[in-house]
Amino acid sequence: MRNPQPDAALAELLVSVAAKQPACRSTETGSATTWSIGGMVFAMLDGGVAEFRLDVPIAAAAQRTPDTSASPRGSEWVAFRPGLMDHEAADRVTAWFQAAARRATG
């Protein structure tokens, strides 16, 4: 998945992964899309930045991967801005979305 437009590829991938989560709901507000389960927001996309609410140890490890940083939302959140949506970036997005969704279901 090599895409010269990482923002569009990131959005497309998130929509695809979310569609496989039956209890997942998406909400669009302005330029941002949030995903929640049972009212708990666990992921969001705003422009080319995706954020995921993970367990703290996973979030800390995720911050050591390329294009990833701490989120201003707190220690459970990571922000991911891929420069290129290659296979590795897509794998991280998919895994983090799924982990965040599992966490939201308790």
Residue ranges: model-predicted function:
Residues M1-G106:
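Charge-dense, helix-prone N-terminal extensions
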